[in-house]
Amino acid sequence: MFTFTTTAYNSQGQALETETHNDSWSACEICLAMSEQFGYAETLDLWGRHSGDYGDRPEALGQRVY
């Protein structure tokens, strides 16, 4: 079973909310909703690999390494 963690950030790069899901599609939908609410959200899998993001990535988080 896979686990996906979605974290929402404000424009200063501070993590504001985190949710964990076992379904990639649910994680994708939550990521979109969080980005609309907070400005940026990204989803990582159980191993910390990038699974998706929405919104404008804050400069404070640096460049995403894929």
Model segments located where?
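Short aromatic-glycine-(Arg/Gly/Cys) micro-motifs in beta-strand/loop hairpins
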Residues: 1-15, 45
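Generic structural motif
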Residues: 9-11, 24, 49
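Surface-exposed loop/edge segments in extracytoplasmic proteins
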Residues: 13-19, 59
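A short, charged, amphipathic alpha-helix used as a generic interaction element across diverse proteins
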Residues: 21-42
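Short, mixed-charge low-complexity intrinsically disordered segments
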Residues: 35-66
